């Protein structure tokens, strides 16, 4: 028993000493890791991480709602346009009715005679085109009624004619531009290489015809003229003297030409 007690007493202090030494060593290692010299600090900052934004892909439900919205937006816009058109038409007709009621409630003195002239002219046109075609039945009454209206209301008819003429001119210009654009597009679609081949073939066909024509009408030169031309050409070749400044004399000088031998 005494031996066991002595063993325990001897082992306990050694264990405590070893634990204290290990703890002290660990603390020293941590302090060494944390401490950094100024020379060891980094000069540049760490580069940022390369991040890329990725958009979230729409799901099936979102795609379904988007397709429904795109398909219904067309019909909604069409219905809205029809509603606005009908609303404006109703408002205009109501306003026209109110103005006509106010005007007819207190009409001017020459209103009834003018209306009578217009109605009589329309009836005259209807009666005159009674036995004619359908076009005459429509055109004659309208034409005579408009003629009576222009006679009774000249200022208003002139204004209406000017406005109608401007609108007709604008529409005719638009139609002309549309037809012109279509015509230019159709002309541009024609292949250009066909035109080039046609031109090349025409030139090829024209050149041999011209050469054959010239050969047929060519006349041979007399012998004297041919000999004269030959002598002229040879004499011109012999009489040609090159410029001494441009000649390569080597180490000699052109002034000392008399001192050189001409033996071959």
Swiss-Prot record:
It is found in: Mitochondrion inner membrane; Mitochondrion. Residues 130-137 are mitochondrial matrix. Residues 1-27 form a transit peptide. Keywords: Membrane, Mitochondrion, Mitochondrion inner membrane, Transit peptide, Transmembrane, Transmembrane helix. Residues 28-110, 156-264 are mitochondrial intermembrane. Belongs to the apolipoprotein O/MICOS complex subunit Mic27 family. Component of the mitochondrial contact site and cristae organizing system (MICOS) complex, composed of at least MICOS10/MIC10, CHCHD3/MIC19, CHCHD6/MIC25, APOOL/MIC27, IMMT/MIC60, APOO/MIC23/MIC26 and QIL1/MIC13. This complex was also known under the names MINOS or MitOS complex. The MICOS complex associates with mitochondrial outer membrane proteins SAMM50, MTX1 and MTX2 (together described as components of the mitochondrial outer membrane sorting assembly machinery (SAM) complex) and DNAJC11, mitochondrial inner membrane protein TMEM11 and with HSPA9. Component of the MICOS complex, a large protein complex of the mitochondrial inner membrane that plays crucial roles in the maintenance of crista junctions, inner membrane architecture, and formation of contact sites to the outer membrane. Specifically binds to cardiolipin (in vitro) but not to the precursor lipid phosphatidylglycerol. Plays a crucial role in crista junction formation and mitochondrial function. This is MICOS complex subunit MIC27. The gene is APOL.
């Amino acid at each position: 028993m005494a031996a066991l007690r002595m063993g325990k007493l001897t082992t306990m202090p050694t264990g405590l000493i070893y634990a204290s030494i290990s703890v002290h060593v660990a603390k020293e290692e941590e302090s060494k890791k944390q401490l950094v010299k100024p020379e060891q600090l980094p000069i540049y900052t760490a580069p940022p991480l390369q991040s890329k934004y990725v958009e979230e892909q729409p799901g099936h439900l979102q795609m379904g709602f988007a397709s429904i919205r795109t398909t219904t937006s067309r019909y909604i816009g069409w219905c809205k346009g029809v509603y606005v058109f009908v609303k404006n038409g109703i408002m205009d007709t109501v306003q026209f009715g109110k103005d006509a009621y106010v005007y007819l409630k207190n009409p001017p003195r020459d209103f009834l005679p003018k209306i009578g002239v217009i109605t009589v002219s329309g009836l005259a046109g209807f009666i005159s085109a009674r036995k004619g075609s359908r076009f005459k039945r429509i055109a004659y009454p309208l034409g005579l009624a408009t003629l009576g209206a222009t006679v009774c209301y000249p200022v208003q008819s002139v204004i209406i004619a000017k406005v109608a003429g401007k609108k007709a001119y604008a529409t005719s210009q638009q139609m002309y531009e549309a037809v012109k654009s279509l015509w230019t597009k159709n002309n541009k679609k024609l292949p250009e290489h066909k035109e080039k081949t046609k031109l090349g073939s025409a030139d090829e066909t024209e050149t041999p015809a011209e050469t054959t024509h010239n050969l047929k009408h060519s006349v041979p030169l007399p012998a004297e003229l041919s000999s004269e031309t030959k002598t002229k050409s040879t004499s011109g070749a012999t009489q040609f003297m090159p410029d001494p400044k441009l000649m390569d004399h080597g180490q000699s000088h052109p002034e000392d030409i008399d001192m050189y031998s001409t033996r071959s």
